[in-house]
Design a protein with these regions (language model features):
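Catalytic phosphate/metal-binding cores of nucleic-acid and nucleotide-processing enzymes, i.e., regions
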Residues: 2-161
Length: 161
């Protein structure tokens, strides 16, 4: 199902089944522009993106940050070694050719945060049009942002009681 949007500046946009919104571009144009990936090419793109982000964070933040080994259903995120205020931070890296799927990705990051007993989980998503690791998108819930800023998840545990 495709829905049309019009922004205040009069530029139209379409939203496709995946929830991707592009200003001034029809879904048909997007699907023609984004080539279909095979499973192998998708895995390669994902691995390359994880390496790009891990290397950037290791150079800028802490040299102990690196890609994690995949562990199946008990996955603890794509990038490990990142800590803030004594708590682990789980990073889920996503390269879907510039498409954003925040709901499922945030859910995956939350599952992996729980598996790792981490302070917060976040998603770093590939931004179309740039390969600069510092220009990629970061997605997280407000609860995870608050945990990151305060160094604990106490506010979340209190809300659940």
């Amino acid at each position: 199902m495709t829905r049309s949007h019009e922004f205040a500046d009069g530029i139209g946009a379409t939203e496709g089944a995946a929830g991707v919104v592009e200003r001034g571009v029809t879904n048909e144009a997007v699907s023609k522009r984004v080539p279909k990936r095979s499973r192998a090419s998708a895995k390669k793109a994902g691995s390359s993106f994880e390496r790009l982000i891990a290397d950037h964070l290791a150079a800028v933040v802490d040299d102990r940050i690196d890609r994690r080994v995949k562990t199946g259903s008990q996955d603890r995120g794509d990038i490990g070694g990142l800590r803030h205020m004594g708590g682990r931070v789980v990073i889920e890296a996503k390269d879907y050719g510039g498409r954003l799927m925040p709901g499922p990705w945030i859910g995956e990051a939350e599952t992996e945060r729980g598996n790792d007993d981490a302070l917060c989980g976040l998603v770093i998503a590939k931004r179309r049009g740039t390969t600069d690791p510092g220009d990629q998108f970061v997605l997280m819930t407000v609860n995870d942002l608050t945990a990151l800023l305060t160094g604990n998840r106490d506010h979340i545990n209190q809300e659940e009681k």
